[in-house]
Amino acid sequence: MAGLMGKYAAFLTRRPVLGNMISSAVLFGTGDVIAQQLIEKKGADHDLPRTARIVTWGGILFAPTVNLWFRTLERIPIRSRWPATFARVGLDQFGFAPVILSGFFTAMTFMEGKDFNAAKVKWHESFFPTLQANWMLFIPFQILNMGLVPLQYRLLAVNAVNIPWNAFLSLQNAKGRKAEEDPVAISKKE
């Protein structure tokens, strides 16, 4: 295991964006599989396009964006470790988290083949409960991550915590899809 981690660390040093893209894609996909198989118990009815969408989000959209964001946060000109950490976490959670979650719900809706109005509906239904859950998990986690973990490993640390978080995101995103596909659920809303 130590040899594998050493190779991964060397790869991250040589190709940080690509390494984080691959890690994020795998871990976002893992979260969706957990959501579908362990929580929703879909079995053979696994929604592969849903998994492909969340893998695409994690690997192609999320990872490069967060990689750049973490490097930007590192430039905050505060020399003392903990004041800099709290400044970074504040910017991350109250500035960046709302943007990236909005991007998630919008991108997932568009990848499902739906229009901007559908994205607005999904955002209104899912954004605030998801943001509150994000803050409960990621504010304490990011204090530790940004205060103690070297920059090149921060996205990997986030991705490790993201396995259960991605299962939650997948469920939040699918919740709106189920209502759209179930005429009984739609008629109950009216």
Curated annotation (Swiss-Prot):
GO terms for biological process: ethanol metabolic process. Keywords: Membrane, Mitochondrion, Mitochondrion inner membrane, Transmembrane, Transmembrane helix. GO terms for cellular component: cytoplasm; mitochondrial inner membrane; mitochondrion. InterPro entries: Mpv17_PMP22. It holds the Pfam family Mpv17_PMP22. Signal peptide: none annotated. The chain crosses the membrane at residues 16-36, 54-74, 91-111, 131-151. It is found in: Mitochondrion inner membrane. It is a multi-pass membrane protein. Belongs to the peroxisomal membrane protein PXMP2/4 family. This is Protein SYM1. The gene is SYM1.
